[in-house]
Amino acid sequence: GHKLKETIYQYIDLWQLGEDFKTWFTECCGVYATLVDRIVPGFPRKEIDSIKEKLQYNDNLVVQAEIFHLWVIEAPEPVAKEFPADKAGLNVLFVPSEEPYHQRKVTLLNGPHTVLAPVSWLSGVNIVRDACQHDILGKYIHKVMFGELLETLNLPKEELVQFGNDVMERFNNPFVDHSVVSI
């Protein structure tokens, strides 16, 4: 959001739209920083035939995604009233700063993914779920997440442990074959 706003101001100047336009944009338009958290392993090769049959057309852009989703929007309170996406049953949070959520996700989801991908692949384990369930790799991933990465974050420990447990549950999702080489 911050970079987008900066870029819009550059174009306002480049296109010589004037100070009135810049004032209007500043006062009337919202540009917000956001964070999306959802594991999307990509094209569902194994299930594509049944998906085509169900949809009754060939969608070459279909992707598989986990059920879990989180959309964090850094915005002032009135935005939640104007855009009540959370009221539609979506996991949307309107917050004063997306930074703690960003740090939590990058550290406790992307971090373990980054750690497990090369060691899993070198061990002949190709799916994230299988790595988590492997006797040695699973313990290693758990130790890295809960014994090292979690300790680097400045958020309530209970919340971090719960998020870490949720991430491990997501990694173990039996319906998502998330390839370690895609990480």
Spans of features found by a protein language model:
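Substrate/ligand-engaging "lid" and interaction regions
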Residues: G1-I183
